[in-house]
Amino acid sequence: MFQALSDGFKNALNKIRFQDDEKALDRALDELKKTLLKNDVHHKVARELLKKVESQTKAGGIGKQQFLDALEKSLLEILSAKGSSGFTFAQTPPTVVLMAGLQGSGKTTTTAKLAHYLKTKNKKVLLCACDLQRLAAVEQLKVLGEQVGVEVFHEENKSVKEIANNALKRAKEAQFDVLIVDSAGRLAIDKELMQELKEVKEVLNPHEVLYVADALSGQDGVKSANTFNEEIGVSGVVLSKFDSDSKGGIALGITYQLGLPLRFIGSGEKIPDLDVFMPERIVGRLMGAGDIISLAEKTASVLNPNEAKDLSKKLKKGQFTFNDFLNQIEKVKKLGSMSSLISMIPGLGNMASALKDTDLESSLEVKKIKAMVNSMTKKERENPEILNGSRRKRIALGSGLEVSEINRIIKRFDQASKMAKRLTNKKGISDLMNLMSQAKNQTPPKMR
């Protein structure tokens, strides 16, 4: 996920070696500029980000930590468009969602992923197949609907408007909570496509119009999203293929250039691989600190309520231990795609694309982590702060690793644990205890 962007941030940070060195800051900003432009970030967005980072770094006194804090804060400001994150339900069901996007963007698959996400929130979902342009699109949605376990409404020899209208009637009569309509896509934007979408929108009067954008499309994707927004009005954007080797330009462009909120990200090829877009967590991954909170939420379904409650308390206090970490790795193997999960683990973000089709168990880095943890005493696993030099040497000897590798893993773990504590206490983020206590058969938290 945006690995080139993340690597560029690290390179920029390494340009600053001494405190209060303005020339070093200039070199860091120059490196940052090159990174942004290379990763398809629009020059206006790049200019704004550089201006923010420079002023905030100087205000705090030039240094690595000040630069890091300024970059993190500036990225958050740009990615946090009003209305970002999650799903908004209508006051009176059904909530009607119109999915739009170009052919090949992953729109139909994303439609099924959204249905799965809502189903996990105990919502009754109806899918409607209105993509009559692409061969087998209806059949694809039927297959995906069967996998998710939701009803798919489809009709033959009817116009798109008639199908949409009948699906809406069905959703109301059968008391569905949500109706999601998969509209037709095109290889390129044309008048016929927009006219059809306008007609379907008029029939449905949807509460949400979600545009599915391919994360690999860069500035072209930003332009397409803008055209759809101008023609039919878009309430939010879903970035598909977010787990791929995509550039960061499209995410920054959609939020800053267009002011459109990012609602979800497709984090893998499997049906469960759809995550609510949370700027704080994405920035955490970009900065190389992983995302322990999302990792914890991913494992919530395989944790019993007591485990979930205990883990959430530890995260809030910054007391996430190596035992917890090892336990999550064992449980998380059952969930989602490897690439999406790997990017959440501290220090493994750059391995996500390489491990797309690889078992977590076979990862060399994970084997190193497990070897290190298994070479610790029970006290050391529960109290990472006591790992002094002599203990680290003993652990290195027992695990077959170099002391430098032990130091690197512990440093990454410590950074991620601190970030998790900071994020769980930020205003606007749901109480993690509520999220973690969402074990199976429990009432889901109230949504936006």
UniProtKB/Swiss-Prot annotation:
The keyword rRNA-binding does not apply. Its EC number is 3.6.5.4. It catalyses: GTP + H2O = GDP + phosphate + H(+). One of its GO terms (molecular function) is GTP binding. GTP binds at residues 101-108, 182-186, 240-243. It is found in: Cytoplasm. This is Signal recognition particle protein. It comes from Helicobacter pylori (strain J99 / ATCC 700824) (Campylobacter pylori J99). The lineage of its organism: Bacteria, Pseudomonadati, Campylobacterota, Epsilonproteobacteria, Campylobacterales. The gene is ffh.
